[in-house]
Each structure stands twice: as C-alpha cells, then as structure tokens.
C-alpha cells in the first residue's frame, strides 16, 4: 500500500510537470501523457491534488512577475512574499479542485463500476471527463480561472482544436481527458500482455478521425471582403503609466497614432485596455473612429471600459464596461487610509453588465477586455446576439512573453468556437489578427511601439457551439450516468441470479 501511494505521488508530480508545460506551450504531445498519469494517480486524491498544484505553478509562473509591487503601495519587504503567495494560492486552488474531482471519481467507481466490465469503465471515464469539461466552463465565468486543459491544444494542434467549433473549450477538455484515459488503459493492457494492440489501433483510428473532423469544421465560406483596421501598441510600462511624464506624453502619442492609422487608410483604430483616463478629451477631432480601452465614472463608481470616439469627435459617445474584474487587482476596495488599493493602479473598480455585445456605428462586435477572454460562453452569447467579429483589448505588462502566448492561444480558441475573426490589441502585445479558422497573424512585435494593420473579415453564420453551447456536453454526461446505472442494474440482476 505504501509503495502504491508513493508511485501515485510520483505519477502526480511528473504528470503535473507535463501538464504545466502543455498549458504553457500548447500541444497534445505534452497533455496526453500528463492526463494518462493523472488517471493512474487519481486512485489517491492526494496524488491528483499534487498533479493540479504542480501544473498550475508551472503554467502560471508568470504571476511572479508582479514583483516588485512597491509602485502600488506594497512595502518593499512584502513584495516578493505577496507575489509568491498569489502564485501559491492559485496552485493550491487547483490542487483542491483536482483532488475533489479525483475523490468524486473514486467514489463513483466504488459505487458503480466495482467488478464491472469495459462498458461500465468507459461510462465512468465519459462521466468524469465531461464533469471536468463542464467544470472548466463554469470556472471560466468566475474570477478565479485563466486557462485550463481545454485551451492547451493551441497553438500546437489546430486540427483537433477545430472540434471546439461544435463543442467549445469544455468539449476539448473532455476529449483530452478521454485521450489520457485511453493511453492509461492501453498501458495497463500492455503490462498484462492482453489486448493492448487492439486498444492502441482503435484509439489511434479514433484520434485520426477526430483530427479530420476537426479540420473540416474549420472551413469558413461566409466571410465578407476584408476591411483594414489599425491597431496601436503603445508599449507603455505599466509601472510608470500613471506618472506625470507619461500622462503628458499620452495625448500627443494617441493623436499621432490616429494620424498614422488615417495615413494607412484604416477604417478605424483600436487602442489597448486602460489607455484613456476618465472624461478624456482628444487634442484634435478624431480623423477616424477610435475604439480604446479606458476608464469612466458612473454614479460615483469607476469602471474599466472600451470607449468609442466617433470620427470628427473628441470624446467617447459609446462604451462597453468590463464585467469580469481581476481579483485583488481591480475589485478589491480601497483599505482605510488608502494604503493598499489592490495589485494595480486602479484598485476598487466596479463591474459592468455581463453582455459582451458592443453596438456602435461600425460592425457589431463581441468584446473581451483582458481577463474576459477566458470566458468563451459570454463571447458566444454576444455572437448569438449579432456580433460579426471579436475584439480583445488588454494590458499584459509587466508579465513576460509566456502570458502573451497563453493569451493568443485563448484568442485562437475563441475564434474557432464562434467562427469569427478576432483582433487582439494589447499594450505590450500580443497585437495580432486571429482568423475564424484559428490561424493567427502577428501585427507587431511584442514590447515595441507601433501601429499595425489587419485585414478583418466579418461573418454572419452561427457555429454549432454558439447555437448549442454546453448542451452536447451535458448530454454526454447524462448518457454516461445512464450507462453507469444500467451497469449497476445488470450487476445487481446477475448477483440475484447467482443467489
């Protein structure tokens, strides 16, 4: 028993390392063996917890770039402990969730699949995989989630990720859990020397068919002729963004970006999250429409928003407020005396409406402001309500390139889910165009200032995921429950007959 537990802990740790690499860099080659090790280790929930802890610590290690935090009022001696505590908290939260999932799986297995055949075991795997997939979707609507197993296929395996066109990120997570289960069961069959060749061949055939089906779903034929849209990447260091010098330079820099976009014959210019201060007024009338991140006041409450300045105007006339705020960074109320306002310069913001639909004089858009990109269901709802394209604005400074890679992976996933082009514009990057097929085109190099031009297509069709959302995944879970129930009844009847 002790050796078995030790082996499970090793499997959990190694699997967590592979999963962390897979989430950080994308690709089934990392995640599939990681999930196979999770299935093997989850007979001990503590080992499964270790898997989640290590996976998140590795994939979210960019959180340590929060240090130094002295610029938001954190005393210098506390800067490293605070940043490390946030990082460790995220790992601990993942450990609890994965541990609970493993405990639930072992409990269900004990009740329903003890001494059961392959059908019951497959039903159990379907149930646990679909529970994981639905859990990721639910967590994506909460403030404590960034990227999970569902987003780990990209950018490495766009063909298999094409299945998100029908099943979304939750479906991709479920599929990868099932691939991991297949690898684990095949490895067990190989150790016994019975049936492993058949298991391997059947699994590889299914995997090949899934890739082919996913690739076929990426085809898009309803795109309009492209429109040139400009993106401004100001590359302003966040830690000095609110200094007097930067605030003096910003209005003229923005005006210059508008002029450059106009010279490029762009239809409009997009600027990143948090650029404009409340009640901002342009130095001169805008030569073309401006969509820029910024702040605004509403009934004494400050909100982060995407602001729209029409051609010929100097102030915003339309907006959409940020709904999903960053924990500690944005929605932590100011403490007495203003000593600590949260881990950003704009602590104490209030959330806006949940809808991500922006209606303005241009083509209707589904908008994600930074952290909101992880919530695919909200963007799919906006597309169902009429959005023709997706817009993601962000400020990922001071975080390193690792976070930018994850941001683009999520952008690709959102484009595939909704069959819409996505324009990403961020302070230091990534500034890129992601086509409805999930293919990305970098507009500007990371951490450099510039104005890039994107040929944006608009789409009218509705994807399967936009139409059905999580209904297929819920149906799969119910199918698995029925399968387990029938296996239990069959086992009970056999026991009665033997008596």
UniProtKB/Swiss-Prot annotation:
Gene3D superfamilies: Carbon-nitrogen hydrolase
Domain CN hydrolase per the UniProt entry, residue ranges: 232-458
Localization in the cell: Cell inner membrane
UniProt membrane topology term: Multi-pass membrane protein
Glycosyltransferase listed as a keyword: no
Transmembrane segments: 17-37, 38-58, 84-104, 131-151, 163-183, 198-218, 474-494
Pathway: Protein modification; lipoprotein biosynthesis (N-acyl transfer)
GO cellular component term, pick one: plasma membrane
Molecular function GO terms recorded: N-acyltransferase activity
UniProt keyword annotation of Membrane present: yes
A GO BP annotation: lipoprotein biosynthetic process
Catalytic site positions: 273 (proton acceptor), 322, 370 (nucleophile)
The family this protein is said to belong to: Belongs to the CN hydrolase family. Apolipoprotein N-acyltransferase subfamily.
Described function: Catalyzes the phospholipid dependent N-acylation of the N-terminal cysteine of apolipoprotein, the last step in lipoprotein maturation.
This protein's name: Apolipoprotein N-acyltransferase
Gene this protein is translated from: lnt
């Amino acid at each position: 028993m002790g050796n078995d537990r030790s082996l499970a802990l090793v499997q959990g740790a190694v699997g967590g390392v592979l999963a962390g690499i897979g989430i950080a860099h994308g690709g089934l080659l990392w995640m599939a063996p990681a999930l196979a090790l999770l299935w093997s280790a989850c007979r001990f929930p503590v080992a499964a917890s270790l898997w989640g802890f290590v996976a998140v610590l590795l994939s979210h290690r960019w959180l340590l770039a929060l240090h130094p935090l002295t610029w938001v009022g954190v005393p210098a001696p506390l800067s490293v402990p605070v940043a490390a505590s946030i990082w460790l908290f995220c790992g601990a939260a993942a450990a609890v969730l994965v541990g609970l999932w493993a405990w639930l799986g072992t409990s269900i297995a004990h009740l329903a699949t003890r001494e059961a055949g392959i059908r019951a075991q497959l039903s159990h795997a379907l149930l646990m995989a679909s529970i994981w997939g639905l859990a990721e979707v639910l967590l994506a609507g909460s403030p404590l989630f960034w990227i999970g197993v569902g987003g780990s296929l990209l950018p490495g395996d766009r063909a298999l990720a094409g299945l998100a066109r029908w099943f979304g990120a939750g479906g991709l997570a479920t599929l990868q859990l099932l691939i991991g289960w297949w690898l684990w069961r095949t490895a067990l069959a190989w150790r016994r020397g019975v049936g492993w060749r058949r298991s391997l061949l059947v699994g590889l055939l299914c995997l090949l068919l899934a890739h082919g089906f996913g690739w076929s779903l990426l085809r898009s034929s309803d795109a309009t002729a492209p429109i040139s849209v400009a993106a401004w990447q100001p590359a302003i260091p966040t830690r000095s963004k609110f200094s007097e010098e930067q605030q003096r330079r910003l209005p003229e820099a923005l005006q210059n970006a508008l002029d450059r976009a106009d010279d490029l014959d762009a239809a409009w210019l997009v600027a990143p999250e948090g650029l404009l201060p409340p009640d901002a007024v342009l130095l001169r009338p805008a030569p073309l429409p401006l969509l820029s991140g910024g702040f605004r006041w509403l009934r004494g409450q400050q909100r982060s928003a995407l602001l729209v300045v029409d051609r010929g105007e100097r102030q915003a006339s339309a907006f959409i407020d940020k709904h999903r705020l960053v924990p500690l960074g944005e929605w932590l109320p100011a403490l007495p005396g203003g000593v600590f306002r949260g881990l950003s310069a704009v602590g104490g913001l209030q959330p806006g409406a949940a809808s991500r639909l922006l209606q303005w004089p241009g083509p209707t858009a589904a908008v994600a402001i930074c952290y909101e990109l992880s919530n695919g269901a909200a963007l799919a709802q906006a597309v169902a309500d009429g959005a023709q394209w997706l817009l993601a604005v962000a400020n990922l400074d001071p975080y390193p390139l690792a976070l930018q890679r994850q941001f683009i992976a999520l952008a690709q996933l959102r484009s595939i889910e909704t069959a819409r082009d996505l324009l990403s514009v961020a302070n230091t990057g990534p500034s890129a165009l992601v086509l409805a097929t999930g293919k990305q085109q970098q507009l500007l190099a990371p951490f450099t200032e510039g104005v890039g031009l994107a040929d944006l297509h608009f789409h009218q069709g509705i994807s399967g995921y936009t139409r059905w959302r999580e209904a297929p995944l819920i149906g799969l879970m119910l199918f698995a429950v029925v399968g387990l129930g029938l296996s239990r009844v069959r086992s009970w009847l056999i026991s009665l007959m033997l008596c």
